[in-house]
From Swiss-Prot:
InterPro entries: Aldolase_TIM (IPR013785), ThiamineP_synth_sf (IPR036206), ThiamineP_synth_TenI (IPR022998), TMP_synthase (IPR034291). Its cofactor is Mg(2+). Pathway: Cofactor biosynthesis; thiamine diphosphate biosynthesis; thiamine phosphate from 4-amino-2-methyl-5-diphosphomethylpyrimidine and 4-methyl-5-(2-phosphoethyl)-thiazole: step 1/1. It comes from Shigella sonnei (strain Ss046). Condenses 4-methyl-5-(beta-hydroxyethyl)thiazole monophosphate (THZ-P) and 2-methyl-4-amino-5-hydroxymethyl pyrimidine pyrophosphate (HMP-PP) to form thiamine monophosphate (TMP). Mg(2+) binds at D70, D89. This is Thiamine-phosphate synthase. Disulfide bonds: none annotated. It catalyses: 2-[(2R,5Z)-2-carboxy-4-methylthiazol-5(2H)-ylidene]ethyl phosphate + 4-amino-2-methyl-5-(diphosphooxymethyl)pyrimidine + 2 H(+) = thiamine phosphate + CO2 + diphosphate; 2-(2-carboxy-4-methylthiazol-5-yl)ethyl phosphate + 4-amino-2-methyl-5-(diphosphooxymethyl)pyrimidine + 2 H(+) = thiamine phosphate + CO2 + diphosphate; 4-methyl-5-(2-phosphooxyethyl)-thiazole + 4-amino-2-methyl-5-(diphosphooxymethyl)pyrimidine + H(+) = thiamine phosphate + diphosphate.
Length: 211
């Protein structure tokens, strides 16, 4: 049963772009996306704070679900919709502070053991990856593939789930067919020849998410 320790999210989050700039956040919100993540890596808090503030303000303006990757202290300080953490960040993060601030929490997983760890934290949603080979970040694990993804989705049938990793426009329908509630994409939009068209097509496949 879905009883998170953090505020809940819609069962289906729909299309979920993960981008590294406020410019992309604004573009995608304007294009109709309503679930997004700002993922800026390897910079100090003071270097990213202005971007986090601007992204959160945009999320509020569009009534969107904006998650901040990793910078949980800034997310709390500026009252983001939510925070997304990788497995390696869970132990070093004050989950009680995130919970007390009323922020949603998403957690990355790559196998059954990591799903167990995520479930113990009782987050708002669980991300399942990486589904396909990806060039976006170095991954220590092998791609799961659609069969493994479907098995994890079935195991987490009551939980909001997000598939991530190497999901292209061509692969998106098969990913959604597993029953996963959301697809997180990066290069499928940011490296598309026509990002507006790619976003519109992905929104048709994955939707904007439940209210």
């Amino acid at each position: 049963m879905y009883q998170p320790d953090f505020p809940p999210v819609p069962f289906r989050l729909g299309l979920y772009p993960v981008v590294d700039s406020v410019q992309w956040i604004e573009r995608l919100l304007d294009a109709g996306v309503r679930t997004l993540q700002l993922r800026i890596k390897d910079r100090r808090n003071e270097e990213v704070e202005a971007d986090v503030v601007a992204a959160i303000a945009l999320g509020r303006r569009y009534n969107a679900r904006l998650f901040i990757n990793d910078y949980w202290r800034l997310a709390i300080k500026h009252q983001a919709y939510g925070v997304h953490l990788g497995q390696e960040d869970l132990q070093a993060t004050d989950l009680n502070a995130i919970r007390a601030a009323g922020l949603r929490l998403g957690v990355s997983t790559h196998d059954d053991m990591e799903i167990d760890v995520a479930l113990a934290a009782r987050p708002s949603y669980i991300a399942l990856g990486h589904v396909f080979p990806t060039q976006t970040k170095q991954m220590p694990s092998a791609p799961q593939g659609l069969e493994q993804l479907a098995r994890h989705v079935e195991r987490l049938a009551d939980y909001p789930t997000v598939a991530i990793g190497g999901i292209s426009l061509a692969r998106a329908p098969a990913v959604i067919a597993t029953g996963v509630g959301s697809i997180a994409v990066v290069s499928a939009i940011t490296q598309a020849a026509d990002w507006r068209l790619a976003t519109a097509q992905l929104l048709e496949i994955a939707g904007v998410g439940d209210e």
